[in-house]
Amino acid sequence: TGTFGSSQTFICGNAVKLACDDLKKKMVEQLKVIYDGCTVKEKDHRYYISGGEELELSFKDAARKILFDPKGSVPIGAGTYKALACPNPFSVCFVKAEYHKKLNAIRLMDIIEVVDVGTPINRLTVAGQLEGGIAQGVGYALYERMEINPRSRRTLSTDFLHYRIPQMGDMPRTYVDMVSSHDPYGPHGAKSVGELATVPVAPAIVNAVRRASGIEINSLPLCDKFAILPTERGNVK
């Protein structure tokens, strides 16, 4: 199933979809009991009853009938899902950076990230995931360092007072967008997003800084080689 944190929409979403499909089938069976002797069919979330009575019920009306009719009961759908494939999401990241030679300093100006996560179930949630992942990638590239005592092997970076991460004012102008596609294995065509947002950010930052400065970079964080200038903070779009 891939990384489990990234696969919640893909794995759980498919399980929920199967449970809903099972629920709709059980609603058909319940309506057959209520409308004894009639034929019941479901199509496009509407229920068609023919035979003794000719009725067309919306999903809401069908649910109400099943719940409150003396012959009805509470239908419960169930679904389980084991991934048959792990579809790959894709991302591309662009970074604009400045290099000030006299100060040996860098400033991030803009970050643009575009992703293919299939059909987004909730575009606002996906955008938030991307923005958070970009911030994590900025911290990884510029500041973050896990310090370990070479003798005791104990972690020295034990709190956020001494472990540098980006604040809101440290973030450059950030733009995110989604290219919609349809994955045949995902719930309603969706794929995972998760760590996808973080992965390309540090390489893009390093490439931008290398091209601006002409300095070869083989290690992170960049604060070991350069001073980090405040960003010209803009709105996230």
Task: Give each language-model segment a name.
Residues T1-K237:
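C-terminal catalytic domains of large/alpha subunits in multi-subunit enzymes
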